């Protein structure tokens, strides 16, 4: 029962916190570049909730990314405004992975002291990755985690070839 894990769903589906044993998820309303002070306060409260176990894997998900990953989206309004302020909040709150979309280019990275994952497009609209000129293929990402080892294993499948993608060719 998915509903059983909700911690805060007052603004569902735009903003909510959800927990299962070993996993704590915070979804932020990052549909526009401005994550205002009210939402930042909510994020801080959600991430520091007594419902969160310190051993939980913590994921934060939102539509717009903290930083640009694809060509044509590296401009104001296409990424979070004041990304360093939000990144500082996420670091202090011990977030394990920040997942975003919008840029339609699969790109796992570490930036601003955080582990970031930009999800690719599943259908039309994949974009070129900044610095490579390569158009990201349609893709699907699967996340697996082990509570015993605190590891997040990410597998991304190229939907054209159905083969696992690697970050070897990424800038």
What are these regions (language model features)?
Residues 60-66, 98-106:
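Histidine-centered catalytic micro-motifs
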Residues 70, 87, 153-155:
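Short, hydrophobic secondary-structure boundary micro-motifs
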Residues 1-57, 77-97, 109-120, 124, ...:
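Extended active-site neighborhood of metal-dependent phosphoesterases/phosphodiesterases
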Residues 34, 67-68, 125, 149, ...:
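Flexible, glycine-rich phosphate/dinucleotide-binding loops
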Residues 141-171:
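A short C-terminal boundary segment appended to hydrolase-like catalytic domains
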Residues 50-71:
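Short acidic, glycine-rich surface-loop motifs adjacent to enzyme active sites
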């Amino acid at each position: 029962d998915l509903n059983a894990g909700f911690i805060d769903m007052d603004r569902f589906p735009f903003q909510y916190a959800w927990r299962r044993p070993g996993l704590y998820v915070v979804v932020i309303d990052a549909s526009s570049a401005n994550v205002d002070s009210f939402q930042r306060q909510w994020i801080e409260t959600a991430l520091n909730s007594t419902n969160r176990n310190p051993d939980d894997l913590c994921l934060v998900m939102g539509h717009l990314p903290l930083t640009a990953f694809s060509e044509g989206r590296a401009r104001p309004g296409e990424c979070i405004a004041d990304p360093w302020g939000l990144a500082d909040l996420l670091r202090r709150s011990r977030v394990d992975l920040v997942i975003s979309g919008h840029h339609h280019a699969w790109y796992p990275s570490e930036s601003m002291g955080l582990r970031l994952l930009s999800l690719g497009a599943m259908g039309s609209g994949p974009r070129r990755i900044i610095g490579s000129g390569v158009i990201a293929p349609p893709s699907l990402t699967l996340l697996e985690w082990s509570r015993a080892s605190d590891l997040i294993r990410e597998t991304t499948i190229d939907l054209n070839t159905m083969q696992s993608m690697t970050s070897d060719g990424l800038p």
